[in-house]
From Swiss-Prot:
InterPro entries: Mur-like_cat_sf, Mur_ligase_C, Mur_ligase_C_dom_sf, Mur_ligase_cen, Mur_ligase_N, MurCDEF_pg_biosynth, UDP-N-AcMur_Ala_ligase_MurC. The lineage of its organism: Bacteria, Pseudomonadati, Pseudomonadota, Betaproteobacteria, Burkholderiales. This is UDP-N-acetylmuramate--L-alanine ligase. It catalyses: UDP-N-acetyl-alpha-D-muramate + L-alanine + ATP = UDP-N-acetyl-alpha-D-muramoyl-L-alanine + ADP + phosphate + H(+). Cell wall formation. It comes from Verminephrobacter eiseniae (strain EF01-2). Its main location: cytoplasm. Keywords: ATP-binding, Cell cycle, Cell division, Cell shape, Cell wall biogenesis/degradation, Cytoplasm, Ligase, Nucleotide-binding, Peptidoglycan synthesis. Pathway: Cell wall biogenesis; peptidoglycan biosynthesis. One of its GO terms (cellular component) is cytoplasm.
Length: 477
């Protein structure tokens, strides 16, 4: 070809979705380079693979590139985008590049407001356990592989489908899961919930006539759209009319036990499932993977092994173990990406079920002023269900501040509600010290948020273990 694409440059390479696509393309034989504003473990890992990376954005970084891929966060006035436009180098949105990848395989796309990353990981793990060696691109690090993505030799590619900017409408899967639909990223849809639901219908209709929609009927909004979906549907959930249904749920520490009943056309034997994840919300995520397995005729034994041995996803109820408390005891630390009230409520319930009787301490960094404004009362209600709360300022994610939708306003409203007395920590950099001062023996600390709070558990661990080491040195004879 006259304009063959050999060198692809990624602007915003450190993002979870971007890094995954870049890694798969690199393994397909393309030359990959990329830039990001800040250094990260993701960038360093890609460097180790042989991918060229740059810190900061400059027009010179795209030298030699045949195409430039951008994330949603990259603006039109980015110097690398401007340089590409000036040189007539194609500028490709991330979702379009993901769609190109999906053309090489049979695509299974996981959509929904919550649970996409965990569900994508579970589906990937089930296919891998069955020997299907899928390609995958996930928004989190799959712990069993240690990466966000992998190029497999099999026929399937499993991807997250992002509704936040409506970019999932670029994808052409042969099977699609919708985990739930809630009001989030409403600015994309003109603050019209009907438009959001309509976008999910349009997404499902991107499948070919032989495609299958795997839909969670426990979500009222998903149930609402079902009459308008013209492709074949397999429903799942805890509801009595679900075709793939879980009953007899039981928590066992950070694991869930349940029985699956399957009656999609043909009634299959019940499955006694052990899931290596906590919470009823993760039972729903596992049910979607089981429904996919039914469609692909994956043996039950492979499904059961995959779910029982699932090693989790980075920042999804991720345990950091026990850390020393100021009073001489120990407290447990769990890190979670959840940042919407629905996600937070599910994770808090999972924590209560997995660790009954423990004092639950929530450390939360709100994500985006617009979400804080739109979900303000729900945030106050959910945070009030914890036993203690440490709250930081909002992680802006590029947004301008919104009056009365900041961290201090949330803390004030939480205090007025009277359920809990919050500790407000303006700078997230001071959060590890604030946690150390407030944690007690036996506490369960849950760090939640999609912003820079993700670095807090690691910094807390380093700080407390260094303090412990120093104390031991002082008391040594």
């Amino acid at each position: 070809m006259k304009h063959a694409i050999r060198h692809i440059h990624f602007v915003g390479l450190g993002g979870a979705g971007m890094s995954g696509i870049a890694e798969v393309l690199f393994n397909l034989g393309y030359r990959i380079s990329g830039s990001d504003l800040v250094d990260s473990a993701t960038l360093r890992r890609l460097q180790g693979l042989g991918i060229g990376t740059c810190l900061g954005h400059a027009g010179a970084h795209i030298e030699g590139a045949d195409a430039v891929v951008t994330s949603t966060a990259v603006t039109a006035d980015n110097p690398e985008v401007l340089a590409a436009r000036a040189k007539k180098i194609p500028v490709v949105p991330r979702a379009l590049m993901l769609a190109e990848l999906m053309r090489l395989k049979q695509g299974i796309a996981i959509a929904g407001t919550h649970g996409k990353t965990t569900t994508t990981s579970l589906v990937t793990s089930v296919l891998a356990e069955a020997g299907l060696d899928p390609t995958f691109v996930i928004g989190g690090r799959l712990n069993s592989v240690g990466a966000h993505a992998k190029l497999g030799s099999g026929d399937y590619i499993v991807v997250e489908a992002d509704e936040s900017d409506a970019s999932f409408l670029n994808l052409l899967p042969v099977m699609a899961v919708v985990t739930n639909i809630d009001a989030d990223h409403m600015e994309t849809y003109g603050h019209d919930f009907g438009r959001l639901k309509g976008a999910f219908v349009d997404f499902l209709h991107r499948m070919p006539f032989y495609g299958t929609a795997i839909l969670c009927v426990d979500s009222p909004a998903v149930r609402d759209i079902m009459p308008g979906v013209t492709c074949p549907i397999t429903s799942y959930g805890l509801s009595e009319d679900a075709q793939v249904r879980a009953v007899d749920l039981r928590a066992d520490g950070a694991r869930m036990h349940f029985t699956v009943q399957r009656s999609n056309g043909v009634t299959l034997p019940d499955l006694a499932v052990q899931l290596n994840l906590a919470g009823a919300h993760n039972v729903l995520n596992a049910l979607s993977a089981i429904a996919v397995a039914v469609e692909l005729n994956i043996p039950d034994a492979a499904v059961l092994r995959a779910l029982a041995g699932f090693k989790g996803v980075g920042r999804r109820f991720q345990s950091y173990g026990q850390l020393p408390a100021k009073d001489g005891g120990q407290f447990s630390v769990i890190d979670d990406y959840g940042h919407h009230p629905v996600e937070m409520a599910a994770t808090l319930a999972a924590a209560r079920g997995a660790f009954p009787g423990r004092r639950l301490v929530l450390a939360f960094q709100p994500h985006r002023y617009s979400r804080t404004r739109d979900c303000f009362e729900d945030f106050v209600r959910v945070m009030g269900s914890a036993d203690a709360v440490l709250l930081t300022e909002v992680y802006a994610a590029g947004e301008a501040p919104v009056v009365a939708a900041d961290g201090r306003s949330l803390a004030r409203a939480l205090r007025v509600a009277g359920r809990v007395e919050p500790v407000f920590v303006a700078d997230v950099a001071d959060l590890p010290q604030a946690i150390a001062e407030n944690a007690r023996d036996g506490d369960l600390l849950l760090c939640m948020g999609a912003g820079s709070i993700g670095a807090v558990p690691g910094k807390l661990l380093e700080m407390l273990r260094n303090d412990e080491h120093t104390a031991m040195q002082r008391t040594a004879p």
